[in-house]
Amino acid sequence: MKKILDFFKENNIEIDNLSHIFVNQGPGNFSGLRGSIATAKGISLSKNLILIGFNTFLWSSTKFIEKSESILSFTKFREKYSFQEFNKNLKKISKIQLINKEELIDKYSNQLKIFPKNIAHTLDKEILKLKNVKIIDLDHNDLELLYSKNLLDKDLIKPLYLG
């Protein structure tokens, strides 16, 4: 909580001026996700703020809204790749799937594949050589677009675990 308060102070943000809190639901570290979500829920309840949840798969896909019929948004978990498929309006086409490198290359080599820049250093070289691989910067401003299109969770905010 101290880090959050320090962040507010350093950036001249008054918590009383906030109306919403956005919290990443994952995928990610078990303890980190639970801690982040619990903190966000606590602040939202105590200050009567709207709590909005998002996941990295959807967030990563935002730059490609209405640009591709199919968007595969990936992250890497240990030696496996997890992904979720979205249509051009960022509606889910698939549930989250966990596959290995060979499956990714065999089944999805020609489709648009998106990876967040913060995991690019963990990607296998063979994956980086595939067609239609995009490494993207995650931009917090994209969350406003997702919110305006009603694509974010507003009800049950819960962690997204892989494994």
Predicted regions, residues:
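Glycine/charged-rich beta-loop-alpha catalytic/anionic-binding loops adjacent to active sites
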Residues: 17-25, 124, 128-130
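Stable alpha-helical structural segments in soluble proteins, enriched in small hydrophobic residues
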Residues: 3, 7-11, 40, 46, ...
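N-terminal beta-alpha supersecondary unit
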Residues: 1-23, 98
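DPxDG-like acidic metal-binding loop motif
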Residues: 20-56
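Oxyanion-binding and handling regions
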Residues: 56-163
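A short linear-motif detector with a strong N-terminal bias
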Residues: 1-3, 30-32, 52, 139-142
